[in-house]
Amino acid sequence: MLKYKPLLKISKNCEAAILRASKTRLNTIRAYGSTVPKSKSFEQDSRKRTQSWTALRVGAILAATSSVAYLNWHNGQIDNEPKLDMNKQKISPAEVAKHNKPDDCWVVINGYVYDLTRFLPNHPGGQDVIKFNAGKDVTAIFEPLHAPNVIDKYIAPEKKLGPLQGSMPPELVCPPYAPGETKEDIARKEQLKSLLPPLDNIINLYDFEYLASQTLTKQAWAYYSSGANDEVTHRENHNAYHRIFFKPKILVDVRKVDISTDMLGSHVDVPFYVSATALCKLGNPLEGEKDVARGCGQGVTKVPQMISTLASCSPEEIIEAAPSDKQIQWYQLYVNSDRKITDDLVKNVEKLGVKALFVTVDAPSLGQREKDMKLKFSNTKAGPKAMKKTNVEESQGASRALSKFIDPSLTWKDIEELKKKTKLPIVIKGVQRTEDVIKAAEIGVSGVVLSNHGGRQLDFSRAPIEVLAETMPILEQRNLKDKLEVFVDGGVRRGTDVLKALCLGAKGVGLGRPFLYANSCYGRNGVEKAIEILRDEIEMSMRLLGVTSIAELKPDLLDLSTLKARTVGVPNDVLYNEVYEGPTLTEFEDA
């Protein structure tokens, strides 16, 4: 069993403490991984991930990543290589370096020179990420999170100036960059990545979370793990499940247990799905969401995957990566202020074969995700000091940079209009009150997801499981229960959490962060392992509960008497508390 060492509160000014902590972490993982040999395929995947890890050291890409989905939206081609004329006259590094101003901005990407001057105002991630790197080789910023063929979509042929002659001098090459970390921090994490325990030793979803917390860059960890403000809702999403208890039946023949069910017209192996999460390449630089697709479809148990609008990979890449044509993939949609872009995107993913649209409605403005904001957007070696001379919002963090294009004027009327434009089932994602579930049923959408964005939006929103317990009896009273399917996500870490939601009437249960962490550490094999863990926990708990099918899960199997008693202490979840890292206070600058 992994020992969750309290390693995170290390004095930054004490080199000896850092060395001791590093040694402790390494010894912990060495001991943990010593009992079971790694499989050949795992070792190969591990080497690939380790080799690629340095490609992730990018701070400025987080401001550029709002363009990831935006630029991938129109990627109708599977061929991801940009169309370049290599016969054009070569351009010297000295010439590139002259064009280093906002009104005269050239950059180098993968050995080719581009004039981005006219593109600057239209860059969804803001001008500054390009402007501060004008006259430089920006490959390390561009490549990890952009499909190469986005260049063809947004850069006119005449702005593709020609191949670079030789290479840019080191001082004009944007370095891999990890805000808030020293070279020693990065080296230690790379070493830890090479010492990950074999998957056979991973026995619960918290193991993935712990390993990710120790190996991800600070910026990636902050983006993945952060919640809004004081993170009360982030914690409450999970803690609410601990205020629900079971009332198991006995003397039931449970030799055969069937956990398959139906969701949105498709038969599925399990009652849970991988919820949409942005920027998987922050944790898995080589494959990103493509490995999630593979992990969801390569094993015995197939799991629906919800593809994010803000994915690091294009919809084409993710769908093509699915091991089987029968694999179920849904699409999570942020509605763009430019509705034509949204309309084109919907047509595209429908043509690609997704089975449903999940329209996110809880993000008219991005929440105050302070852990993310602490690692301020920085584009140059000079960092924030240089940026203070501009009007860039230094403290926006990755989340704020990502939110630029989302339409804050979205209304119920827009949902009804969207229904007319697609044959796909439409599910409203981010519903947080019973009255809105009733409204959704009345306008005829196919489903809702009770969700507060993983506690990343309005702090002190209620836990989705609590909203579910309140909502389902009212839907039944109004004869609306069969009008739409109700899903729930947020805070789920155990098979018992899934069963509690199903007992209360949920059609399916979504998990996001656990699969992010599994993918970050082990790629597709980690995703498959996380699925196996959750599946086994559900099957075991159903036997202990005295039921053999999803249809037998009813509210009478639960004790809800303390669900709303938020002032009553919940059972101490030791593993959750060990891996949870809350917001921090601002520190003094180094002298």
UniProtKB/Swiss-Prot annotation:
FMN hydroxy acid dehydrogenase domain residues: 197-563
Compartmental location: Mitochondrion intermembrane space
Chemical reaction(s) catalysed: (S)-lactate + 2 Fe(III)-[cytochrome c] = 2 Fe(II)-[cytochrome c] + pyruvate + 2 H(+)
Transit peptide: 1-80
One record GO biological process: lactate metabolic process
Binding-site list for pyruvate: 223, 334, 453, 456
Induction: By L-lactate. Induced during respiratory adaptation.
EC number: 1.1.2.3
Molecular function terms, GO-annotated: heme binding; L-lactate dehydrogenase (cytochrome) activity; metal ion binding
Pfam families to which the protein is assigned, alphabetical: Cyt-b5, FMN_dh
Main location (coarse class): mitochondrion
Ligand binding (heme b): 123, 146, 177, 219, 223, 376
Null mutant phenotype: Inactivation of this gene leads to a deficiency in L-lactate dehydrogenase activity and consequently to the inability to use L-lactate as a sole source of carbon.
CDD domains: FCB2_FMN (cd02922)
Needed cofactors: FMN; heme b
Cofactor mode of binding and number, as noted: Binds 1 heme b (iron(II)-protoporphyrin IX) group non-covalently per subunit.
GO terms for cellular component: cytosol; mitochondrial inner membrane; mitochondrial intermembrane space; mitochondrion; nucleus
Miscellaneous note of the record: Present with 4590 molecules/cell in log phase SD medium.
Domain-related comment: Consists of two discrete domains, an N-terminal cytochrome b domain from residues 81 to 179 and a C-terminal flavin-binding domain from residues 180 to 566. In addition there is an extended C-terminal tail. The cytochrome b domain is required for efficient cytochrome c reduction.
Name of the molecule in the record: L-lactate dehydrogenase (cytochrome)
Naturally occurring in which organism (per UniProt): Saccharomyces cerevisiae (strain ATCC 204508 / S288c)
